[in-house]
Amino acid sequence: MVSVAEIRQAQRAEGPATIMAIGTANPANCVEQSTYPDFYFKITNSEHKVELKEKFQRMCDKSMIKRRYMYLTEEILKDNPRVCEYMAPSLAARQDMAVVVVPRLGKEAAVKAIKEWGQPKSKITHLIFCTTSGVDMPGADYQLTKLLGLRPYVKRYMMYQQGCFAGGTVLRLAKDLAENNKGARVLVVCSEETPVTFRGPSDTHLDSLVGQALFGDGAAALIVGSDPIPEIEKPIFEMVWTAHTIAPDSEGAIDGHLREAGLTFHLLKDVPGIVSKNIDKALIEAFQPLNISDYNSIFWIAHPGGPAILDQVEEKLGLKPEKMKATREVLSEYGNMSSACVLFILDEMRKKSVQAGLKTTGEGLDWGVLFGFGPGLTIETVVLHSVAI
């Protein structure tokens, strides 16, 4: 008779979880950051708030963002004037948009990832869908299953309202699924859209204005699996270790609340300080077992919540400017896309590594770290190992 231990052993994969393919997608509507304050104050009928507009212009100028992509066009906003007010009841209108566009943009990214993977979609065994944009039943995971024509018995996981750290969360979950289910191929999708958070300016709630200066729309998809099939599946990164922690004394640093007026965000001024204060401990826990203490010797993928967070992390750890190059590039070209950001950075890094003729997908280095920061204040850590190009 076969023992439970033997059954469990047979169910597990042999090797580490690997990222086998990456796809990204954005709405067609591109917004230039330099002209966004004019558009934003005009469409929200707030042009009379001259001092506030000047303050918002300075926020945009300091954001290090060149452009963002947004589903919300001038035409859509004119058709939904209550979305343009600061706290007008508008949840139904926001939800009606989000439940359609979130899975649709996720599909665009997923199709690209599946194409790069090169295997039939019938081999997908698990689906993880993550969004902070809208809530519905059945969820965006169900809608994507239908849009892609996946098998009805694909094992689905729907993650709502996680926020900006969730790019790390989906990798942690995908790693566990791939390594504990032999032959599993996990489709991971993060799709984020701004209809739930867009609103007019407020003189008294400047943290809301910070979000309006930073957030953009985007979706990213990955195929994750262990024991890649030789000559058919080509891993891009290996996921070696993950951790999840709540930073001490950080309650209320970042939080969001779903109200009749949509999803409202609240930020403390010292979020960059809280992140930089706690990142050293996270790195020691992750890299001490590998005998790595020089954090300039690894590649970096950090959620770009804003330039201040990246600046303080660099200063705290003495990082060279090039360490955050891929992260800053994604922030510049797309803005803060919440959970999707770190997956965009993974894609950016592996592409630039190939273009530059480097020896590995991690900027020529072997080891790297991926950080997600978000509500809680929650920190997700993923230790990555690059793959030879």
Swiss-Prot record:
PROSITE patterns: CHALCONE_SYNTH (PS00441). Pathway: Secondary metabolite biosynthesis; flavonoid biosynthesis. Its EC number is 2.3.1.74. Pfam families: Chal_sti_synt_C (PF02797), Chal_sti_synt_N (PF00195). The active site is at 164. The keyword Acyltransferase applies. One of its GO terms (molecular function) is naringenin-chalcone synthase activity. It is an enzyme of class 2 (transferase). The primary product of this enzyme is 4,2',4',6'-tetrahydroxychalcone (also termed naringenin-chalcone or chalcone) which can under specific conditions spontaneously isomerize into naringenin. This is Chalcone synthase 1. The gene is CHS1.
